[in-house]
């Protein structure tokens, strides 16, 4: 490992220590709680939308969240390890076949929906059936 990779790994470990970053990807609906500073006041604002892509890696990783606000599409790019992000919560998992969902920008209404990924539950073991 060269010097730059070593320094990036140290910074990544330092920034990600004590914070929970859930596993999520394109198609997942997420709520990002962002710290907003207005004058001297600070508050947390929730931003809910569909993750349309992740880019970068390590300390430079970021993700893009798209939502429809008052009929207008709004996209916001968040650095994954930003100190302005209070928390990230995955609301639902989406079933998609692409890494970047930029095609959603041109879709409206029902065609822009993403089907939910079904979670496979383990089969219940019935006592006495294995005999």
UniProtKB/Swiss-Prot annotation:
Which Pfam families does the UniProt record give? Answer: Ribosomal_L19 (PF01245)
Write the record's keywords in alphabetical order, separated by commas: Ribonucleoprotein, Ribosomal protein
GO molecular function, a single term: structural constituent of ribosome
Highest taxon of the lineage: Bacteria
A GO CC annotation given for this chain: cytosolic large ribosomal subunit
Heme: is it a keyword of this entry? Answer: no
**Which biological processes are named by the entry's GO terms?**
translation
Question: Gene3D superfamilies from the entry?
Answer: 2.30.30.790
The entry's family comment says:
Belongs to the bacterial ribosomal protein bL19 family.
Role description: This protein is located at the 30S-50S ribosomal subunit interface and may play a role in the structure and function of the aminoacyl-tRNA binding site.
This chain belongs to the protein called: Large ribosomal subunit protein bL19
Tell me the organism's taxonomic lineage.
Answer: Bacteria, Pseudomonadati, Pseudomonadota, Alphaproteobacteria, Hyphomicrobiales
